[in-house]
């Protein structure tokens, strides 16, 4: 294991000892805020320290067994050789486990997201594919036990959507969906194509983490233009009777968000403001991300929304994930909500990328 990682583990071990003492201090116990903060940190550090203590014990056992390899007794040497092999195997497993424990956590992973799907090149066929992608993610969300709500939709003339914006709520939503941002390309024969020619269309997907209310980016109300209009979306008999839909324009950036799915103008405004905050935070994060990418090229997660990340080829029943050269002949399963088959290899590749950089 790299010396820099061992140093990190030693520092964590010292912090663990310090936290143990603090949590037993009467003054800390009396102050609930500090006690909760220290308890949370203790819970995060404790499993790492337990694994590190086991690592050190096995390392010491290995050193002892290696010393016996020089003994004059052949039976003792044979026994020591077995112990060395066993200790090396355990040590390798513990080293891998500790490295994964030390990987930096994305603070956004636990957040809910705003999922934006927009038809790109390809006209009607692109809009139909946007509808297919929305169904794919909706079914995946259902399998994950997440809740998905439509904030805004602009239907295509022959089905699907020119644009559909949703909010996805649940456990580890951003952690699972964060690498879905980018250009998704579809190759198939449109129903209106009489010659059987394959057409290529594209949609763009953007996944934005919903900011924490306390840490949300500050928005100056004076920099907003708020328009109300009559909803053309859900609402049954109530549609077009009230100006409940909201459109908010952030004047400095030109970013426009709108929400029309609720009957209440107040609810639509609150959801539109949350979405605007997410877009402004994403804009800010993208600038910082570009700096990181220039320093170290990330195989997965470059964050470029124009990057072609995946191709769905219907005639061949094939899905190709271009960032990791993954090809699956399971298109029907993926489109039916089985996109986990693509998401998991992406997350594994990203973790491998992080491991390679750990301790640099």
Swiss-Prot record:
Its main location: cytoplasm. It is found in: Cytoplasm. Keywords: Cytoplasm, Methylation, Protein biosynthesis. InterPro entries: PCRF (IPR005139), Pep_chain_release_fac_I (IPR000352), Pep_chain_release_fac_I_sf (IPR045853), Prokaryotic/Mito_RF (IPR050057), RF-1 (IPR004373). It comes from the Bacteria. One of its GO terms (molecular function) is translation release factor activity, codon specific. One of its GO terms (cellular component) is cytoplasm. The keyword Cell membrane does not apply. Peptide chain release factor 1 directs the termination of translation in response to the peptide chain termination codons UAG and UAA. NCBIfam families: prfA (TIGR00019), PRK00591.1 (NF001859). Belongs to the prokaryotic/mitochondrial release factor family. This is Peptide chain release factor 1. It comes from Azotobacter vinelandii (strain DJ / ATCC BAA-1303). The lineage of its organism: Bacteria, Pseudomonadati, Pseudomonadota, Gammaproteobacteria, Pseudomonadales.
